[in-house]
């Protein structure tokens, strides 16, 4: 499957029915999800691999990994409603994905894998400052390779945070197209600069 084909397929995924601002529940744009997944695919980190989507939300990254030929794909999220939507999305696209209700703060229900893909919270809400740290910690604990979406300019922070535990071996700039989802949003569409980081466990 080519990049454009993947993007078109992922555009069919439904978003959150009732998104919660406190959890920064924003649907990962299909263009950005496809870019992350295709970079991972070209690097040999998807096909025939066991892939985990941490904080999978409605499942777009997990589903894309399955469409690119991952041997086994699992997605985990704390929100049961989001997981129900993820299951519907997977069925719609014929993707074989196992979705699990679990908190990334505890790895008891999260088995080791070859590759983690994730779009962790950016910590934009006051109550969510550093909300991406548990995701990074969990990813390093369960997989040798991680691909994550972070706010532009986060590379230095991530490098310092994972020092001695992992290294950033790839970085791709991108844009997160954020549609108006909550009353505090002042624009119908906001383009947020982001970066996709490839992290390899030390």
Question: For the regions a protein language model found, what residue spans apply to each?
Answer:
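Class I S-adenosyl-L-methionine-dependent methyltransferase catalytic core
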Residues: 1-202
């Amino acid at each position: 499957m080519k990049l454009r084909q993947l993007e078109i397929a992922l555009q069919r995924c439904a978003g959150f029915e009732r998104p919660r601002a406190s959890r920064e529940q924003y649907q990962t744009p299909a263009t950005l999800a496809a870019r992350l997944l295709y970079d991972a695919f070209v690097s040999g980190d998807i096909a025939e691999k066991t892939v985990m989507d941490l904080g999978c939300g409605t499942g777009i990254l997990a589903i894309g990994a399955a469409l690119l030929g991952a041997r086994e794909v699992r997605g985990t999220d704390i929100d049961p409603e989001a997981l129900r939507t993820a299951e519907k999305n997977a069925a719609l696209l014929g993707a074989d994905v196992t979705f699990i209700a679990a908190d990334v703060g505890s790895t008891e229900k999260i088995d080791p894998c070859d590759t983690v893909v994730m779009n962790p919270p950016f910590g934009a809400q006051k109550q969510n400052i550093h909300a991406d740290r548990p995701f990074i910690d969990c990813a390093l604990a369960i997989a040798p390779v991680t691909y994550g979406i972070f706010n532009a300019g986060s590379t230095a922070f991530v490098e310092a945070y994972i020092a001695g535990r992992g290294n950033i071996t790839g970085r791709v700039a991108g844009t997160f197209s954020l549609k108006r989802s909550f009353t505090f949003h002042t624009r119908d569409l906001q383009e947020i600069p982001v970066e996709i980081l490839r992290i390899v466990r030390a």
